[in-house]
Amino acid sequence: MKKYFITFGGGHQNFIDAGNRLTHQAKQLDIFDNVILFTDEILKTEHADTFWDKHGKFIEENKRGYGYWLWKPYIIQHVMKTLDDGDILMYLDAGCEILQHKREKILEYMKYVESEQIIGSKTAV
């Protein structure tokens, strides 16, 4: 079983910086096999034919949520398609923080996911 962490930082330098900070925090936990930061540049280049060509104009015309968060289900689904059964995916918004002293709590949640399949939360750990 592999554990993946993803976030998105794009649209404005503040969000790119927040995404970089968050992926750094995720790597420091030493829990995840793969930590992925999606950016607007990645959507425009690596996902041009599957996402950007269709939604780019809307995103650029609607600044709030970088296109009303249209990218969020896309990046989650994109990564989920690559997972094997039993793998775990954790997504956090770039404005979140991962506190190192919460590592054990995150591992506890991952054990819960093994039996319950999914956890959703509107607040951080």
What spans do the regions from the language model cover?
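Active-site flanking residues adjacent to catalytic metal/cofactor-binding acidic residues
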Residues: 92-94
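Conserved donor-nucleotide/metal-binding helix-loop-beta segment in metal-dependent transferases, i.e.
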Residues: 96-125
